[in-house]
């Protein structure tokens, strides 16, 4: 079954996508040997909360 989204829902999805994109871009700058997933989680949380 296909559920149609309202314009507002699409706007929210677009905003969420931008936040995910920004988070992944920031994580890309910090991924290197020796960096733990806990550290990456903290960075991701910081970026997400800043939006």
Swiss-Prot record:
Known function: Removes the N-terminal methionine from nascent proteins. The N-terminal methionine is often cleaved when the second residue in the primary sequence is small and uncharged (Met-Ala-, Cys, Gly, Pro, Ser, Thr, or Val). Requires deformylation of the N(alpha)-formylated initiator methionine before it can be hydrolyzed.
InterPro entries: Creatinase/aminopeptidase-like, Pept_M24
E.C. designation(s): 3.4.11.18
Keyword set, alphabetical order: Aminopeptidase, Hydrolase, Metal-binding, Protease
Protein name in UniProt: Methionine aminopeptidase
Cofactor info, note text: Binds 2 divalent metal cations per subunit. Has a high-affinity and a low affinity metal-binding site. The true nature of the physiological cofactor is under debate. The enzyme is active with cobalt, zinc, manganese or divalent iron ions. Most likely, methionine aminopeptidases function as mononuclear Fe(2+)-metalloproteases under physiological conditions, and the catalytically relevant metal-binding site has been assigned to the histidine-containing high-affinity site.
One MF term in the entry's GO annotations: initiator methionyl aminopeptidase activity
Domain of life per record: Bacteria
UniProt similarity note: Belongs to the peptidase M24A family. Methionine aminopeptidase type 1 subfamily.
Catalytic activity: Release of N-terminal amino acids, preferentially methionine, from peptides and arylamides
Cofactor(s), names only, from the UniProt record: Co(2+); Zn(2+); Mn(2+); Fe(2+)
Tagged with keyword Metal-binding: yes
Acetylation is among the record's keywords: no
Enzyme class per UniProt: hydrolase
Gene Ontology BP annotations: proteolysis
Subunit structure, interactors included: Monomer.
């Amino acid at each position: 079954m296909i559920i149609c989204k309202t314009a507002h829902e699409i706007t929210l999805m677009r905003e969420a996508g931008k936040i995910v994109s920004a988070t992944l871009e920031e994580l890309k700058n910090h991924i290197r040997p020796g960096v733990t997933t806990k550290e990456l989680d903290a960075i991701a949380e910081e970026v997400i909360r800043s939006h």
